[in-house]
Amino acid sequence: METVQLRNPPRRQLKKLDEDSLTKQPEEVFDVLEKLGEGSYGSVYKAIHKETGQIVAIKQVPVESDLQEIIKEISIMQQCDSPHVVKYYGSYFKNTDLWIVMEYCGAGSVSDIIRLRNKTLTEDEIATILQSTLKGLEYLHFMRKIHRDIKAGNILLNTEGHAKLADFGVAGQLTDTMAKRNTVIGTPFWMAPEVIQEIGYNCVADIWSLGITAIEMAEGKPPYADIHPMRAIFMIPTNPPPTFRKPELWSDNFMDFVKQCLVKSPEQRATATQLLQHPFVKSAKGVSILRDLINEAMDVKLKRQEAQQREVDQDDEENSEEDEMDSGTMVRAAGDEMGTVRVASTMSGGANTMIEHGDTLPSQLGTMVINTEDEEEEGTMKRRDETMQPAKPSFLEYFEQKEKENQINSFGKNVSGSLKNSSDWKIPQDGDYEFLKSWTVEDLQKRLLALDPMMEQEMEEIRQKYRSKRQPILDAIEAKKRRQQNF
């Protein structure tokens, strides 16, 4: 729908929504054109600002947390003004939904582009994207702000190829509770060791995440993506820094850049300003080298949408002839409470569809996913069904399943009674497991069998901590729902 932008150029540049606009209903200020995608925090729509004709993105977020925290984070976004950070124009609070109006980046996220093209990026493309990303991080860190969710899904490109940081301070960090639920615990693959260990962290935590993102762009997915997120939580602080699967494919400069990012000690990790002087970044080419891959990705998206529409039209004809009989080419939508039918999508839902890797990365990683045909609702905004339960993070479903298993099987207790002592079962801080050589086979087998119950106990502690933080927030929401207003 880029023709809308070309035929109706902005009459003036939108910098910020004025007070008059913020007192109106959002539908009076914007015309929604289409749904762009779905993220872990809600839906994203493409819209046009009626007064200026400017294209914007609107993220509709169901608010399940402390409104005061959200307002505080939005005030932080209002302070940011950089060409390398997605601009924030204003917000509307309507019922229990937060509508966030932001800068529109027509090419989508780097993660989207990788998935659509079915290709990883070249070193030149990665260097150009990293250069813009580092400039954005340098700005945020100069403002003493931490992004906390750097990954390919949160680096957006406009149609000219300029990379911009997204989901800073608003949808990516609504509150500590939501951030830990959807970022730290739900997708730990990009998180710095000090963040996972909760020992305090500063701006260079973003640099570790940037190093992981560099590997993600090169290989299609981050390290540890093939294992359960909860296991990754314990492995990242303990194991040596990750590196490329096939180092021989990459230049010394690129590998050294990643090495500088992935230093486990925060005090010794490079800053954004220092990394902008790294040879790999200083030799980066202009954004024009990204235009071909952007055009290719947008062409693929358009062709898929056209093909999907043809399938829908064909199936509609078949359905009209068969009078509500299911077509053999259609499948029931999982979890569809309305019982409607949709065409089976041929797109992979994972973060990686490259041939050399399996599609094992969990799909709900907080990265916007491209629409399937059934998600398109004629460009209208759709309010969240209040009867629907919010999607559970994968690790909570994992908890619940394990709890059921533990009720049936008391094996964990039996094993724990036979352990030598609790100190023997702690993960060595230096990663040295030489002491295992002195253990008997029987002791080793007991240790192996006891690992899962131990992990369940540690996860239960995390869950209890989550609950203790969540309940006061829920109580506060009830009090603040009576004060619905635009801001």
Curated annotation (Swiss-Prot):
Q: Which cofactor does it need?
A: Mg(2+)
Question: How does gene deletion manifest?
Answer: Mice show progressive hepatomegaly with a 2-fold increase in liver mass relative to total body mass at 1 month of age and a 3-fold increase by 3 months of age.
Q: Which residues in this protein are found as Phosphothreonine?
A: T3, T183, T340, T367, T387
Provide the alphabetized UniProt keywords: Acetylation, Apoptosis, ATP-binding, Coiled coil, Cytoplasm, Kinase, Magnesium, Metal-binding, Nucleotide-binding, Nucleus, Phosphoprotein, Serine/threonine-protein kinase, Transferase
The entry summarizes how activity is regulated as: Inhibited by the C-terminal non-catalytic region. Activated by caspase-cleavage. Full activation also requires homodimerization and autophosphorylation of Thr-183. Activated by RASSF1 which acts by preventing its dephosphorylation.
Using the record for this protein, list the coiled-coil segments as residue ranges, or answer none.
289-311
Record EC number: 2.7.11.1
Supply the enzyme class, top level.
Answer: transferase
Query: Site positions for Cleavage, renumbered to this chain?
Result: D326, S327
The listed locations are: Cytoplasm; Nucleus
Q: Which residues bind ATP?
A: L36, G37, E38, G39, S40, Y41, G42, S43, V44, K59
Spell out the residue ranges making up region: Disordered: 305-334
Q: Which reaction does it catalyse?
A: L-seryl-[protein] + ATP = O-phospho-L-seryl-[protein] + ADP + H(+); L-threonyl-[protein] + ATP = O-phospho-L-threonyl-[protein] + ADP + H(+)
An annotated GO cellular component of this protein is: cytoplasm
Q: Which residues carry this modification: Phosphoserine?
A: S265, S320, S410
Entry's family note: Belongs to the protein kinase superfamily. STE Ser/Thr protein kinase family. STE20 subfamily.
Please describe what this protein does: Stress-activated, pro-apoptotic kinase which, following caspase-cleavage, enters the nucleus and induces chromatin condensation followed by internucleosomal DNA fragmentation. Key component of the Hippo signaling pathway which plays a pivotal role in organ size control and tumor suppression by restricting proliferation and promoting apoptosis.
Indicate the quaternary assembly.
Answer: Homodimer; mediated via the coiled-coil region. Interacts with NORE1, which inhibits autoactivation. Interacts with and stabilizes SAV1. Interacts with RASSF1. Interacts with FOXO3. Interacts with RASSF2 (via SARAH domain). Interacts with AR, PKB/AKT1, TNNI3 and SIRT1. Interacts with MARK3 and SCRIB in the presence of DLG5. Interacts with DLG5 (via PDZ domain 3).
Q: What is this protein called?
A: Serine/threonine-protein kinase 4
Organism, scientific name? Mus musculus (Mouse)
